[in-house]
């Protein structure tokens, strides 16, 4: 009986903690103040947990931690980018990772993500030329995956980063950002992976567009940007 009561108490506490993120409604216009590294967010928009070709990567991050909020313009940008990818990347499922909290400010284990204009995107992965989703389903643990300098997964060398799909998605993000009054201000990807990315057809287009990739990173920052690419945006109007 005591064990049952304890379980019910834990479930109740979890539901209370998750409730604000379960029943949240988007409305109005967001206000982002400051920078991704030192800012805040008002009237945040909650990213969709699932669409026809995308999904938020972790229910714990989404419902309990609440790191699924962005500026209203970025919300529409991400939504539009995935819609474009329905055409440019047919059959591919994408995973969105951590964004900002409801009011911005410090986010656990992140130095930025503070004003609703940053988002992490999971690297798409392929095995024998086809998308593999096995490692997309491990939630927060995905941040701990390691890819070597050529984009091979340390746990399974047959699994590699799909740089072509990544490039198509970044192009879609750039297109959508411009339509929604934003511009991509910075992309962070493990330095050693950039050459393979820019050698692809779509990587070359990204370079032609002048989208800025971080040129140098501290060792600690560099090593954790292999399983995802971080994108900062800036308001332009």
What residue spans do the PLM features occupy?
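Active-site acidic/histidine clusters and adjacent loop/turn architecture
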Residues: 30-96, 162-172, 176-178, 184, ...
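Envelope-exposed proteins and targeting segments
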Residues: 90-92, 115-119, 225-229
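Extended, low-complexity, intrinsically disordered C-terminal regulatory tails
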Residues: 77-108, 186-216
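Catalytic cores and adjacent binding grooves of peptidoglycan-active enzymes
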Residues: 130-237
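Bacterial N-terminal signal peptides
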Residues: 7-15
